[in-house]
């Protein structure tokens, strides 16, 4: 996620006026389409017009050119770019697999981005209004955004990703336009990415029946049996690792860049820095069709026939059955977070639930599972339960979830609930949130063995005092 200035808008639409066919784009790739409820309010649908895109990012109404937000000249933020990147295995399917499977991978990616946009609009998008000298978050009519699908990396490897460029304008539900409140968006950026990836797994499995496997990275040292998982990533099961490494030149160049400058094992921060410093321009003279032929030839040099990728279809039927949410993975991920902070916010739980779903879940289901977990924790935490009640019974009808304090819980409480009570809640998604028997299981007494640790954590929480996430 990065800020977009008006001077950078041309990256997304700069080559559209040339009239290049969509299948031949490399640097600019797709012409882009308008997405989000706010775009509809501005009567912007379908393919992006470059002139209108510049106008909207400049904070002006494309219908009558009136200003939609205050302008601070060159200091104004035009928008925010959220990049949704498919795993390398999905990129390979989309650009090298036989047509039917390739199209399914592309459609699954598009559907997952749309699902993530829905999550943003429900949870992480809004505006700020001042009432009686007090600033409030107010719900908005939806995001004003354009999605640009790109299919190559800067090293010209298969790399399916979408730039979701959200304009820094939004209409509050009371009808007034202004700049957006991006603070909640930045707080939720980890959850947004996890929701996208879970939705992608769900969509692609539903369409093709492929199976998934967790990715163990050297940097993260992800070992499930250790009890703590720094990160959870998934790739399509059954793809030759050689094929994935063959088309990961950009990642390899970043690691080499860090190594040349005396870095050891490249951390996420070092990799981000290297990404921006060691960033080549895309070759405008290449076509996707030409690159696809070159990719297939390169794979053939290593004895790999991309046509064999079709055998991945339907593998989920042969895989051992698994829970919709892996309880051990969920607990391990939350335990890792608990080593870094004494409390967990709702967005942390959403991200963990999404990451721990082997075959993925739609965003609304991820939210429902996370809410079920939060409710189970709140049953044993009067403060958290009061927060949930306050959110549900806000006296101001214009305020939505984005306008109130996000609920949060003692991290140890969340981990304990997952370990001791949550397994029956996630074993059958059909029962989550709708079965009174399951709700009763969530209200089970806290094991006495955990009481001393619970009291210590709660005392630590009380010393911190009540704070909103704005601070």
Predicted segments with their positions:
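Short, amphipathic alpha-helical interaction segments positioned at domain boundaries
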Residues: 388-403
């Amino acid at each position: 996620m990065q800020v977009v200035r008006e001077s950078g808008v041309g990256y997304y639409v700069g080559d559209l006026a040339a009239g290049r066919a969509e299948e031949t784009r490399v640097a600019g790739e797709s012409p882009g389409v308008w997405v989000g409820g706010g775009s509809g309010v501005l009567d912007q649908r379908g393919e992006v017009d470059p002139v209108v895109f510049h106008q909207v990012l400049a904070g002006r109404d494309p219908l009558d050119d009136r200003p939609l937000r205050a302008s601070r000249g060159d200091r104004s933020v035009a928008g925010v770019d959220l990049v949704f990147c498919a795993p390398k295995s999905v990129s390979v399917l989309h650009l090298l697999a036989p047509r039917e499977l390739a199209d399914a991978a592309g459609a699954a990616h598009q559907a997952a981005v749309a699902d993530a946009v829905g999550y943003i609009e429900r949870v992480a998008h809004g505006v700020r209004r001042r009432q009686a000298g007090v600033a409030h978050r107010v719900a908005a009519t939806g995001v004003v955004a354009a999605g640009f699908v790109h299919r190559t990396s800067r090293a010209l490897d298969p790399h399916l990703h979408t730039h979701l460029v959200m304009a820094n304008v939004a209409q509050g539900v009371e009808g007034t336009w202004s700049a957006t409140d991006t603070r909640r968006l930045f707080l939720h950026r980890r959850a947004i990415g996890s929701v996208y990836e879970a939705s992608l797994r769900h969509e692609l499995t539903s369409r093709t029946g492929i199976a998934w496997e967790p990715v163990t990275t050297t940097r993260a040292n992800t070992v499930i049996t250790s009890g703590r998982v720094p990160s959870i990533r998934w790739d399509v099961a059954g793809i030759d690792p050689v094929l994935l490494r063959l088309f990961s030149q950009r990642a390899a160049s970043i690691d080499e860049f860090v190594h040349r400058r005396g870095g050891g094992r490249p951390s996420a921060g070092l990799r981000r820095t290297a990404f921006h410093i060691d960033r080549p321009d895309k070759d405008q003279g290449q076509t996707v069709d030409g690159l696809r032929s070159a990719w297939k030839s390169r794979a053939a040099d290593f004895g790999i026939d991309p046509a064999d990728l079709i055998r991945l279809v339907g593998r989920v039927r042969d895989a051992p059955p698994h829970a919709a949410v892996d309880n051990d993975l969920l607990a391990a991920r939350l335990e890792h977070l608990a080593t870094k902070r004494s409390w967990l916010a709702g967005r942390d739980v959403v991200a963990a639930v999404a990451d721990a779903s082997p075959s993925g879940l739609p965003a609304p289901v991820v939210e429902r599972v996370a809410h079920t977990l939060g409710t189970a924790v709140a049953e044993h935490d009067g403060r958290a339960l009061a927060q949930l009640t306050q959110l549900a019974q806000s006296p101001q009808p214009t305020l939505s979830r984005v306008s109130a304090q996000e609920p949060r819980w003692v991290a140890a409480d969340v981990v304990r609930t997952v370990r001791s009570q949550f397994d029956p809640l996630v074993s059958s998604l059909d029962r989550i949130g709708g079965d009174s028997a399951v709700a009763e299981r969530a209200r089970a007494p806290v094991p006495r063995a955990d009481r001393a640790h619970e009291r210590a954590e709660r005392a630590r929480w009380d010393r911190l005092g009540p704070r909103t996430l704005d601070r």
